A protein has these predicted regions:
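Conserved PRPP/pyrophosphate-binding segment of the phosphoribosyltransferase/PRPP-pathway fold
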Residues: 1-113, 120-152
Length: 152
């Protein structure tokens, strides 16, 4: 937050250690961070979800993949939007980059989809829908965030 990458890494490692100790996450084979649109990434210089995902993947012994999911439409900031506006804002904003490549990865039994903050769940749900098109129901997709905004 505000460029404090060290704190983000620290809290991400703590969450990753907690998750690694849980039977619910021991079988995670891949961690996928929610992508930023390329313009926002360029402006900010980094994707905080990737930083969090890297630490959690390391603690879980899982592979982190930033190349599989893309934000194909700039959605703008959602901080002042209503729940319905947020839902409409992210609908169709995410796509699988290379379906063939992803289909080759279907031996992964459990994917962890990660975002930095959870408000309404619309962003994570839009990403989940994009991944579910490619991955069969036998592949479990869990979600995790480092933060939660109440009353969004």
């Amino acid at each position: 937050y505000h460029g404090d990458v060290a704190s983000g890494r620290y809290f991400s490692r703590m969450l990753g250690r907690y998750m690694a100790a849980s039977a619910h996450f021991r079988d995670v084979g891949m961690v996928i961070p929610v992508p930023l649109h390329w313009r926002r990434r360029w402006k900010r210089g980094y994707n905080q979800a990737e930083i969090i995902a890297a630490e959690i993947a390391r603690e879980l012994g899982a592979e982190m993949r930033c190349d599989l999911l893309a934000r194909v439409r700039s959605t703008g900031t959602q901080t002042k939007m209503s729940v319905d506006e947020k839902s409409a804002n992210v609908k169709g904003a995410f796509e699988v980059r290379d379906r063939k490549k992803l289909q080759e990865l279907t031996e992964v039994g459990h994917i962890l989809l990660l975002d930095d903050v959870f408000t309404t769940g619309n962003t994570l749900f839009a990403c989940f829908q994009a991944l579910r098109i490619v991955f069969p129901p036998s592949v479990r997709i869990s979600v995790v965030t480092l933060g939660f905004v109440d009353g969004a």
